[in-house]
From Swiss-Prot:
Name of the protein this chain belongs to: Probable GTP-binding protein EngB
Stated family: Belongs to the TRAFAC class TrmE-Era-EngA-EngB-Septin-like GTPase superfamily. EngB GTPase family.
GO biological process: division septum assembly
Record PANTHER family: ENGB-TYPE G DOMAIN-CONTAINING PROTEIN, MSS1/TRME-RELATED GTP-BINDING PROTEIN
NCBIfam families named among the record's database cross-references: GTPase_YsxC
GO molecular function, one term: GTP binding
Keyword annotations of the record: Cell cycle, Cell division, GTP-binding, Magnesium, Metal-binding, Nucleotide-binding, Septation
Cofactors required: Mg(2+)
Function recorded in the entry: Necessary for normal cell division and for the maintenance of normal septation.
Domain EngB-type G span(s) in chain numbering: 25-199
């Protein structure tokens, strides 16, 4: 298994939808979660870069699909946050369409990291994301973020509860706790990404370049 240097991760581009993304080759691992689940903080902690992914004080600001390259043909994708109530309905629909299209049609997508606040896990949209990934044979890592907000006993109890709950999806779903503040769970995240990037089959360029 190759140990990738996530500190070398760099921003490639932002795209409003799948049509504006670069060619569908290599391996992509996407990060998804509700607007306040700590997605940007997790990406910054993973890569040890303070501002790789912009953390917004206003949840729901990340409206674009953001691509980052870890190594040649190995990319991390920051998907638009979902489930934020104060976003105009039309904008919400636009994001959901872009999100759904990416998840459904992007061949190079081979792993999905679903982030959820440990204090509010497995909301409806989180479950839909996991269900969709399992149906598409995509491996899932659930990160229960902001784990530092709970005492050790409560943290373990919630971790076990969520691990038990995801068995119902009958898929490749792993659950871990994570804290950007305390750097907790970062090694587990890196290990999982290393495994995915090493073992998954990269999508090759087709001859006509499509």
């Amino acid at each position: 298994m190759t140990n990738l240097n996530y500190q070398q991760t760099h921003f490639v581009m932002s795209a409003p939808d799948i049509r504006h993304l670069p060619s569908d080759t290599g391996i992509e691992v996407a990060f998804a979660g509700r607007s306040n689940a700590g997605k940007s903080s997790a990406l910054n902690t993973l890569t040890n870069q303070k501002s790789l992914a912009r953390t917004s004080k206003t949840p729901g600001r990340t409206q674009l699909i953001n691509l980052f390259e870890v190594a040649d043909g190995k990319r991390l994708v920051d998907l638009p946050g979902y489930g934020y109530a104060e976003v105009p309905e039309e904008m919400k629909r636009k994001w959901q369409r872009a999100l759904g299209e990416y998840l459904e049609k992007r061949q190079s997508l081979q792993g999905l990291v679903v982030l959820m606040d440990i204090r509010h896990p497995l909301k409806d949209l989180d479950q839909q994301m996991i269900e969709w990934a399992v149906d598409s044979n995509i491996a899932v890592l659930v990160l229960l973020t902001k784990a530092d907000k709970l005492a050790s006993g409560a943290r373990k109890a919630l971790l076990n509860m969520v691990r038990e709950a995801v068995l119902a999806f009958n898929g490749d779903v792993q659950v871990e706790t994570f804290s950007s503040l305390k750097k907790q769970g970062v090694d587990k995240l890196r290990q999982k990404l290393d495994t995915w990037f090493s073992e998954m089959q990269p999508v090759e360029e087709t001859q006509d370049g499509e």
